[in-house]
C-alpha cells in the first residue's frame, strides 16, 4: 500500500476483461481493493495491504474456474503477489494460473522461480495474447506456438514463445470494460487518482501506448517497446463521453507514458472535448517532449478542463540528464512550465534523487532548478528515491555489478519505500544514505518554501483545500491522503 496515493480503477484488467467478453468468454473480476476499501492489514516488515485478505480472495473465486489471471504492474507489489499466486494456485490446482503486467514482462524467469503454481507469464501487451492463450488452453494445444508468453512446461522447464508484434491500431481494441468492477465503491469512497472528484468518479484513460525515448531508469520498453502509437482524438473523446453518460464521471486521469508528442493531436483532443460540452476536468503528463506545450497548447488544455499537467525533469543537472538519457532541455521545460501556469494550469514536477554517479554538485543544480521552476509557476512537486526497476538499463547495470539481489526482499522493500524519507536505501557511491535522505526532504522544503514566498496567499488556499477535501493539485491530495491514512486501523490477519 502506498502511503501517498489513493487506489484507482485498474485499467489493465478492464482492457483484458473487454477483449475476453467480446470473444464470448465468461469473465469474473475480483477488484481486491475496491471490494474491501476500509480493510487494512499487516503483511510483513511493516508493509500494509489495503483490501481483501488472501482468504477472502480465494473464497470469491468461482469453483469451476478454468483460468485465473493476475495483473502485476508494479515490482513493489511482488512480495505480496507471489504469496497470493501460490495461495490461489494451491486451492485451484486444475486451473491455469496466468500473470501479466510490467513487472512480469520485465523478469518472467524470476517470477517462475519464486512461485510454485504460476503457469504462464504474458509479456508485453496482453489483449491479443490472452485470446490466443485461452483458445490454446481450451483446445489443449501446445503453448510454444504462442507469441508473447513464457510458460512452465510439464517437465518444469521455462519456455519462451517468440516476441509478439505490437498492436498498431489502438482504435480497433475494445474500450476498457468497467461493468465487472464495483465502480459504486470507488465513487462512495472517493477512491480515484483524480482531482476534485468528491461528487463523482475519476476514470483512468490511455490515449497512447509506448514511448520513443529510452531513459535508463525506465522499464517501459519491456512492456510497451519504443514504438509510439496513438488513438485518434475522436476515439478518446468518444470513450470519455461514454463514461460521462454511463457513470456520470466528471474527471479523467491520463496514464500515458508520453501523452504529448504531436501538438496538433493534443489540440484536436481539446477541441473534441470542448465541442461535446462534457463539462469535465482532466489531468495529463507532459512526457519528455515538454517543448510541445507552448502558450497555444496550454490555452487549449485549460479551456477544455485540464486542471493538472505533470512534467518529469527528474533532475536539474545536465550531466545526470545526459547519463540517464533523459532527452530534455531544461530551459525549454521552464518556459513550458511558465506558459502552462500562466494559462491557469496546476503544474506538477517529478524529481528523483540518488542516481548512480550523482554528486553533491548535481544536487545543488537540481535545487536551483526547483527554485526556478517554482518561480515560473510550478506549484506541486513529488520527489522520490531512485530505485532500479527490473528491465531498465540501470537495473541491468547494477545487477551486473552485483549491487542488486532480487532474491533478497530488501530490494522490493526499497521500491515500496521510494516515496518515504527514512527507510529507503540508495544505489549511489558518492553520497551516504543519510545525505541523500536529507536532500530528499530538502527538495520538498526548498520547493514549497520558495513557492509560498513567491505566492504567499497560496499557503492559505492549500490549507483550505486540504481541510475541505477539495484538492486542486496532486500535492494537496497527497497531504490529505496522508492525514486520512494516519487514522487507519490496521488489523492482523493470519497467513
Name each region found by the language model.
Residues 64, 393-398, 406-495:
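Radical SAM enzyme core and accessory elements
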Residues 25, 89-95, 116, 140-142, ...:
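Short helix-capping segments at alpha-helix termini
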Residues 19-20, 28-169, 391:
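Glycine-rich beta-alpha loop elements in corrinoid/cobalamin-binding modules
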Residues 31-36, 222, 256, 351-353, ...:
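Residue-level recognition of beta-strand->loop/alpha-helix junctions
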Residues 36-38, 108, 213, 263-264, ...:
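Flexible glycine/acidic-rich beta-alpha junction loops that bind and position SAM and/or redox cofactors
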Residues 8, 171, 176-348, 368:
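Radical SAM [4Fe-4S] cluster-binding motif and immediate context
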Residues 110-114, 297, 357-372:
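Catalytic cores of alpha/beta
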Residues 2-13:
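Glycine- and acidic-residue-enriched helix-capping/strand-helix junction motifs
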